[in-house]
C-alpha cells in the first residue's frame, strides 16, 4: 500500500514506458489469464511478420487444411477394410473398361492416334461425329425390321382367321325339292349349279320364287255371254242418267224457294223509304 503514489525502488524510472509495452514477438495478442511459460513459447510453423495480415491468413489456411486432413483420416479409419478393398477394385475395373473401350472405338473407326499437330478437342469432335453416324444407321435398320415384323404378324393373323373359319358359319340357302325340279326343267343343269354356288357365298343373298299354276293362271278367263255384258252396260248407263237429273232438280229447288224472300225484303225497304219521305 505504501508503494502506491511513488516509484518502485527496484526498477529504474527511465524504463517504465518500455516495461508497460508488450514484447515484440507477441504484439497484437493478449495473453489469457493463467497461461504458463511453456504455453507462451512460440510454436514452429509458417508465420509472417508480426504486424502483417498475410501471416494471419496463412495461419488460418494451415489450420483449415489440417482439420480437413484429420477428418478424412478419421473417416477412412471408421470404414471397414473389406469395404475399402471392394470400392477400390470396382473403381479400378470401371476405369480400365472405360480406357479399353475408348481405345477400341478409336482403332475400330480408323481414327489415328493423336499427332503432335492436332489438338485434343478436334479429335474428340471427329470421334463424336463418327459415333453419331454409326449409331444412326443401326437405328433406321432396327425401325425397318420392327415394321416388317409387325406387317408379317398382321398377315399371319389374317391367314389364321381365314383358315379357322368353317363353312358352317357362312350363310347358306336351302332349296326345296320343288324349286330344284322346277329349275331343272326350265334351265340347264350347269346354270343351276352355278346359281346355287353363287347363292351359297356370303356376299350374295338371293331368293328365287315361282308361284304355282294353281295360284295364278296364265290367261284371263273370258266372259260366258257377251250379249249379257252389253245389256248390263246399257242398264248401268240408264241408271246413271236417271240419277243425274234428279240431283239437278234437287239443286234447283232451293233457288226457286229463295226468290219470294227477296221480293218481300224489297217491298219492306221501299215502304220504309216512303215513310221517311
Curated annotation (Swiss-Prot):
The modification Phosphoserine is found at residue 52. Keywords: Coiled coil, Cytoplasm, Cytoskeleton, Methylation, Nucleus, Phosphoprotein. This is Coiled-coil domain-containing protein 117. Residues 22-69, 216-242, 255-277 are annotated as: Disordered. One of its GO terms (biological process) is positive regulation of DNA repair. One of its GO terms (cellular component) is nucleus. It is found in: Cytoplasm, Cytoskeleton, Spindle; Nucleus. The modification Omega-N-methylarginine is found at residue 47. It holds the Pfam family CCDC117. Residues 225-242 have a biased composition (Polar residues). Residues 58-69 have a biased composition (Basic residues). Residues 23-55 have a biased composition (Low complexity). It comes from Rattus norvegicus. Interacts with CIAO2B; the interaction is direct. Interacts with MMS19; the interaction is indirect. Facilitates DNA repair, cell cycle progression, and cell proliferation through its interaction with CIAO2B. The keyword Nucleus applies. Residues 139-166 form a coiled coil.
Amino acid at each position: 500500500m505504501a508503494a502506491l503514489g511513488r516509484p518502485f525502488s527496484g526498477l529504474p524510472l527511465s524504463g517504465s514506458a518500455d516495461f508497460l509495452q508488450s514484447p515484440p514477438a507477441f504484439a497484437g495478442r493478449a495473453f489469457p489469464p493463467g497461461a504458463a511459460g511453456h504455453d507462451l513459447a512460440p510454436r514452429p510453423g509458417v508465420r509472417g511478420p508480426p504486424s502483417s495480415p498475410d501471416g494471419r491468413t496463412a495461419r488460418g489456411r494451415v489450420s483449415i487444411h489440417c482439420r480437413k486432413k484429420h477428418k478424412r483420416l478419421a473417416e477412412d479409419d471408421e470404414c471397414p477394410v473389406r469395404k475399402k478393398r471392394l470400392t477400390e477394385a470396382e473403381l479400378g475395373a470401371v476405369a480400365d473398361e472405360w480406357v479399353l473401350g475408348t481405345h477400341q472405338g478409336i482403332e475400330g473407326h480408323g481414327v489415328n492416334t493423336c499427332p503432335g499437330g492436332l489438338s485434343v478437342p478436334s479429335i474428340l469432335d471427329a470421334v463424336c461425329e463418327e459415333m453419331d453416324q454409326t449409331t444412326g444407321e443401326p437405328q433406321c435398320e432396327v425401325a425397318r425390321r420392327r415394321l416388317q415384323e409387325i406387317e408379317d404378324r398382321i398377315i399371319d393373323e389374317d391367314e389364321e382367321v381365314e383358315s379357322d373359319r368353317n363353312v358352317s358359319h357362312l350363310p347358306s340357302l336351302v332349296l326345296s325339292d320343288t324349286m330344284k325340279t322346277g329349275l331343272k326343267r326350265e334351265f340347264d343343269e350347269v346354270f343351276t349349279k352355278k346359281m346355287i354356288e353363287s347363292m351359297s357365298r356370303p356376299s350374295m343373298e338371293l331368293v328365287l320364287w315361282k308361284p304355282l299354276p294353281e295360284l295364278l293362271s296364265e290367261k284371263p278367263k273370258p266372259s260366258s255371254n257377251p250379249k249379257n255384258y252389253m245389256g248390263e252396260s246399257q242398264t248401268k248407263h240408264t241408271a246413271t242418267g236417271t240419277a243425274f237429273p234428279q240431283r239437278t232438280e234437287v239443286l234447283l229447288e232451293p233457288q226457286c224457294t229463295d226468290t219470294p224472300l227477296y221480293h218481300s225484303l224489297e217491298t219492306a225497304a221501299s215502304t220504309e223509304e216512303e215513310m221517311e219521305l
